[in-house]
Amino acid sequence: MAKIDASKLELTEKVVHIARVAKVVKGGRRFSFSALVVVGDGHGNVGAGLGKAGEVPEAIRKGMEDAKKNMVSVPLIGTTIPHAILGNYGAGSVLLKPAAKGTGVIAGGAVRAVLEVAGVSDILTKSLGSANPHNMVNATMAALKSLKRAEDVARLRGKTVEEILG
């Protein structure tokens, strides 16, 4: 998979989750913030990142930088994905199914954010297991990374697309 140069893309970002986290030290607690951010160009490129800092805006900025470093390309067929897929991360699983035009994004919070910035506008999803935003975002990213076009599968197997699709 080729590395995506985020500097050449017009990216939109969404903050999925912000948490105040604490480090317990001898003198009490040290508070900081972590921000889970997704970025995408709306045309099949998407990335997710985690930023941690003492202040919220700085954590969001760091999350955006991390997300730009972890971008993947999603094969889209029109406004949906080529086939159904199950993505796993930790105890969270996300089922993604292609949908007819006009269906919209049927998804929960964290999964919806990833799909919207990726440019998927018609999809059915089901979140299974953990509802933790980190697990949901990473499971969605894992599913999107695993998607393949019929042409690519046919080329790998040395067959025609018609033979693959039956």
UniProtKB/Swiss-Prot annotation:
Oligomeric and partner information: Part of the 30S ribosomal subunit. Contacts proteins S4 and S8.
GO BP annotations listed: translation
Superkingdom, natural source: Bacteria
GO CC entries: small ribosomal subunit
The S5 DRBM domain, residue ranges: 11-74
This protein's domain notes: The N-terminal domain interacts with the head of the 30S subunit; the C-terminal domain interacts with the body and contacts protein S4. The interaction surface between S4 and S5 is involved in control of translational fidelity.
Listed GO MF terms: rRNA binding; structural constituent of ribosome
HAMAP family, alphabetized: Ribosomal_uS5_B
Bridged cysteine pairs (disulfide): none
PANTHER family registered for this protein in UniProt: MITOCHONDRIAL RIBOSOMAL PROTEIN S5
UniProt keyword annotations, A-Z: Ribonucleoprotein, Ribosomal protein, RNA-binding, rRNA-binding
The protein's name in its UniProt record: Small ribosomal subunit protein uS5
Role, per record: With S4 and S12 plays an important role in translational accuracy. Located at the back of the 30S subunit body where it stabilizes the conformation of the head with respect to the body.
Family listed: Belongs to the universal ribosomal protein uS5 family.
Pfam families, sorted: Ribosomal_S5, Ribosomal_S5_C
